[in-house]
């Protein structure tokens, strides 16, 4: 997945979840933040950020903030991109083989899962979660309590009972992490429900990403530690 019209800037502040103040070539700009999560460990004053300039003149903001540097690590923080990256990867035949039928945004029960797949007799639901939180080389999710995330996991368990396969894929939007684990400190219940889901047959996967200022590509599997 590639971006266009990338500019580097410097993060100044975040007045609310949706916008940030940045400096580009000495000029202050208001940009749209493509992640409504807290991201407090990423968006610190002075951090180098990468922005995509929009070609839509009617927009209120000219730029989208899509990536940030944390030390020497480049982290993509576009919360809309993990689904697209995984779908692109699956359509190349990864994980389930070539020729799979893939349908995004498919309703099941009271939820809408990110992907539904059919491969031969197999019927599969998949939920995708983007991960931007990294602490001491460990990738963690979530960075804030997520009742919606718990609901999705419980619905995946129901899928298993009804004969479907179920997957939850954590897309770590960076490279060079040691492993992935649920963020018990932030949301202990999410960690508990995720472990119970794996024990019930839900496949829990984590993959890192190759990240450049203008691109992101799904990388390699990362060890998942649930206990």
Regions found by a protein language model. Name each.
Residues 137-147, 157-186, 208:
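Nucleic-acid nuclease catalytic cores
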Residues 173-227:
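Domain-level recognition of nuclease-like catalytic cores that cleave nucleotide substrates
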Residues 9, 113-143, 156:
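Conserved catalytic cores of phosphodiester-cleaving nucleases, focusing on short active-site segments
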Residues 16-21:
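Short aromatic-glycine-enriched beta-strand elements
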Residues 45-56, 208:
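Flexible glycine-rich surface loops and low-complexity tracts that mediate binding to linear polymers
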Residues 40, 72-102:
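Acidic-basic catalytic patches of nuclease active cores, encompassing PD-(D/E)XK
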Residues 56-73, 219:
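OB-fold/S1-family single-stranded nucleic acid-binding modules
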Residues 27-41:
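Beta-strand/loop nucleic-acid-binding surfaces
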């Amino acid at each position: 997945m590639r971006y266009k019209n990338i500019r580097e800037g410097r993060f100044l502040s975040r007045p609310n979840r949706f916008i940030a103040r940045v400096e580009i070539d000495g000029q202050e700009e208001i940009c749209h933040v493509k992640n409504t999560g807290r991201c407090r460990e990423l968006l610190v004053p002075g951090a180098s950020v990468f922005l995509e300039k929009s070609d839509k003149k009617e927009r209120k903001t000219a730029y989208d903030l899509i990536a940030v540097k944390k030390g020497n690590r480049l982290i993509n923080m576009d919360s809309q991109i993990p689904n697209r990256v995984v779908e692109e990867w699956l359509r190349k035949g990864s994980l389930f083989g070539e020729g799979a039928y893939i349908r995004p945004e498919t309703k099941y029960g009271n939820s809408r899962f990110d992907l539904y797949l059919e491969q031969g007799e197999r019927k599969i639901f998949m939920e995708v979660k983007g991960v931007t939180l990294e602490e001491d080389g460990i990738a963690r999710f979530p960075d804030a309590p997520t009742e919606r995330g718990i609901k999705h996991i419980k619905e995946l368990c129901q899928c298993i009972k009804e004969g479907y396969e179920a997957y939850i894929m954590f897309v770590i939007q960076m490279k060079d992490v040691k492993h992935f684990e649920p963020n018990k400190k932030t949301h202990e219940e999410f960690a508990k429900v995720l472990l119970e889901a794996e024990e019930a047959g839900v496949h829990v996967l984590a993959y890192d990403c190759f990240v450049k200022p203008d691109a992101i590509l799904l990388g390699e599997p990362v060890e998942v530690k649930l206990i």
